[in-house]
Amino acid sequence: MKILRITAQGLPLFKKDLDICFYTQQRVCEEDKDSLYRLTDNYYLHAACAFIGINASGKTSVLKVISLALNIVKNEPINHVEAKSILGGAKNVTIRTYFYDKRSYVCCLETVIAAKKSKTGEYVYSILSESLWEKPIATVKSKKYLTDFTGMKPVEQRNNDEAYLSDDVSFIIAHNKKANDTVEIFSLLSYTNVNVLPFTEDIPLEVIAFLDPTIEKLCFEQTEGKTFIHLKFKDEKEIILNNAADLEQYLSSGTIKGIITFSMVKEVLHSGGYLLVDEIENHFNKEIVTTLVRFFMDSRLNKNGGTLIFTTHYPELLDEYDRNDGICIVRNRNGITAENLSYILKRNDIKKSDAYQSGFLEGTTPAYEAYMRLKKSLAASIN
């Protein structure tokens, strides 16, 4: 299963409907094909999707919507999904997830969700209604109509009388079983500010050597229900730990996050799934970040169409992209918006980092007035 597009209406934090495309919007040249994933014929998907914006612009919120939509089509109960918080207390949120399945069909799943407060004061979410549309991709005349289901009747609609289905689980579960299809999701959203290495049976030595060449050995061992961590630096004695949190005393945050991230990268490239990373530059130097992005943009390495979806503050990272349509500019001006860069910047030959930092794209640099107020406040406190 490959996600083509996600739209969302009725979200409390958003200024207008959210609309994110994962397939190419601009014309695909021969030289572009090396950094894209070929879906079929002339349809290509972005292997690395960037969401960039200043602090508090809403980048994490956009990532949460994507995570929620992915988990819905994966049959996860909404109330068990961490990203459900993006729904807030909304009474009517409509999420449409467009995807391409194993049968070579383009499908549209529309899920309408409502919040209700429980006795404990927490919101509990349930699906009010659901519909599924589908069409063979062979019947699509051009890219313009790839996700257009205008005038078509749904092939299936949710029947809430079905006792076997929990009211927060999508009825897409039946479609996925029939088509023997699913979507693999790997998320680093919960690791943005927390760096504790989870138990893993296999940490590739190549990953460790890339991140910290002084480490000779790092592995987990389980004996009689207890977990031990073996850590050895070159020319040093082996250290044995029984708590992963203690690794922070010996390894940098970047190394720990790197091991978690690159271990997931290996899984995503193998499965053709999705990796969600918030603040990709957090704890990493620029070279590690660009390496990560380039792995996904290498069509010879990324044969199965693994997709990296990330947020960043790094304008320089935009220059890794030859195209504009794999980048979204996130702004928060009385509500969050996410706009595809190809709609704002028509030419690919303009240096993207310069356009971003110059303020040419609007809402991408901190307001000058806020800067002056901060400067005056600091000056007053020093005197």
Role assignments for model-derived ranges:
Residues 2-67:
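Pre-Walker A-like glycine/lysine-rich segment at the N-terminus of P-loop NTPase domains
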Residues 9, 184-250, 369-383:
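Extended helical coiled-coil dimerization/tether regions that scaffold
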Residues 44-50, 54, 64-115:
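Conserved P-loop NTP-binding catalytic core
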